[in-house]
Amino acid sequence: MDSSSFIQFDVPEYSSTVLSQLNELRLQGKLCDIIVHIQGQPFRAHKAVLAASSPYFRDHSALSTMSGLSISVIKNPNVFEQLLSFCYTGRMSLQLKDVVSFLTAASFLQMQCVIDKCTQILESIHSKISVGDVDSVTVGAEENPESRNGVKDSSFFANPVEISPPYCSQGRQPTASSDLRMETTPSKALRSRLQEEGHSDRGSSGSVSEYEIQIEGDHEQGDLLVRESQITEVKVKMEKSDRPSCSDSSSLGDDGYHTEMVDGEQVVAVNVGSYGSVLQHAYSYSQAASQPTNVSEAFGSLSNSSPSRSMLSCFRGGRARQKRALSVHLHSDLQGLVQGSDSEAMMNNPGYESSPRERSARGHWYPYNERLICIYCGKSFNQKGSLDRHMRLHMGITPFVCKFCGKKYTRKDQLEYHIRGHTDDKPFRCEICGKCFPFQGTLNQHLRKNHPGVAEVRSRIESPERTDVYVEQKLENDASASEMGLDSRMEIHTVSDAPD
């Protein structure tokens, strides 16, 4: 063998072993260079691991100089503890009732693999409900109170759900039917809540009964509406402090969710299945098509092409778009559809769209990226950089530091405006005395103090936005205006002095 040749070897488990050792160091509190505070509870971690696992930490401009960070968006410390463990191990165990909390936290931290897995869990909930169980409960609901609402506690309300991402070499391989490994221990609190709720038939005589399953969490409640053996919506009841605020934009269309009133409670309905909601279908139903006489036929004609969307915008902290008038029209449209009203009655309905252009425009209202939404105020953005700059205001991040005095700012333009006070950059000039000032406010004070009564000075103040072309053009206009005024005054003077 040649002594200059290279010998290569590969240890497949080395990377996972390094992460495992880092996790042991984290649990022991050794060599940790940052402390993340969640609701006052500290969590020690390594910046490199956080930055490699979460784009939120990676794009944090001041992370390299910080020794501590507080995140107020995540309300449950246990949720962040599981997500932090996931960064080191690639595994996470969560209860089904906490999926919404994990989805909200993962969306804020931009952990895409957790977001996709939580969304997949919500979409696959309908596979845990047997159609035969629903039919049997409708007949013997009074005989078997523990199986009311057509749900088996032991098969649906599971305690930990195991999540293993594809890149985790130690994770278990998912089965063909589902990616969830569920224990069969039922929750007593959930079972008692199911017994108290009972099943409710909200439809008319010709409609399909709806069975509600209450999922109780720490901060949210969800109603899963079962229609025609498919869960098509997740309805999240918001607390008073977390209620979505009114907005000028509508939540209908391709956002995948809307707001409505259920039993006097305002809820946010989210499409999680492969079928759109029946309310949205009633609004976009074509006039030329044959109108179904019941909800079952309406669901039969729904399209399968509606993709599920990100759930971030519909849960706590997200600002839901709503218009109550449209919700009333949609409700009346659905009632007319269930009662088998003819096309003339639907045309007389104020909520029915008679024009194909209106129906086409309805599906394209207010498009935006659901994942670029501020968790604090619900404002949506088109670019990630705009969201990052906006989040600095809520997080108190001040990456722009003045090199003269050390004062910190959240935006670069604020720092540039502040630096004018330290340098000779004085773009605001007084037209009366020629003195220059670094700020517009300082110039205004100078005018009020030293040049009172000058009404036209403010309109002639030069600002940094005005170019030399603008100034030259304005001087030419002023000169021509003065010549015209002089000519008119001379003409008047000549006429008045003329002999009779």
From Swiss-Prot:
Chief place where the protein resides: nucleus
Zinc finger (C2H2-type) boundaries:
372-394, 400-422, 428-451
Any idea where the BTB domain is? Answer: 32-96
Q: Per its UniProt record, what Pfam families does this chain match?
A: BTB (PF00651), zf-C2H2 (PF00096), zf-C2H2_4 (PF13894)
State the Gene Ontology terms under molecular function: DNA-binding transcription factor activity, RNA polymerase II-specific; DNA-binding transcription repressor activity, RNA polymerase II-specific; RNA polymerase II cis-regulatory region sequence-specific DNA binding; zinc ion binding
Query: Per the record, where are the segments of Basic and acidic residues compositional bias?
Result: 193-202, 236-245
Gene Ontology cellular-component terms listed: chromatin; nucleoplasm
Expression across tissues: Expressed in several tissues, including heart, brain, thymus, skeletal muscle, small intestine, testis, kidney, placenta, peripheral blood cells and adult and fetal liver.
PANTHER family, A to Z: AGAP004733-PA, ZINC FINGER AND BTB DOMAIN CONTAINING 34
> What's this protein's name?
Zinc finger and BTB domain-containing protein 34
